[in-house]
């Protein structure tokens, strides 16, 4: 039995599967998985990540003429996503950390689950800007210049924020747990 291609879009919000702007639907559907991954790196929460990714796509939809004509539409979309993430955290002022990780499969040994939990806990302890720089560098694999464009700052600021974030992560008790030597 051949699967219906629409089944693959089940996780994609309806707003991005109805093309209101020429090319928006294809653009949004192709970027959806990466947006959710990036938002998850910023939030550590799967459901919040999907909400933020939807918000980013909704804002991109409204500004589709500008986004589609931008030199780098992906950078434009990343900036929308990062701004939406920062707005969400400012609005919520999260004081309680989620206790459970989402039930996503992990390839590899069971100890990777513990390492992943420790990394997410350590990332949650970073200030939002440092967490954003770490996620954009190591999860999205962006250069200093691309991160600077996304955050609206200089590459030097990106490097200093990255350096501070890495120093804090090295000192993090969450990442120190489980070290056997």
Predicted regions and their residues:
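A short pre-motif secondary-structure segment
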Residues: 133-137
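Conserved RNAP core-binding helix
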Residues: 36, 46-63
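Helix-turn-helix DNA-binding module
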Residues: 124, 128, 140-157, 168
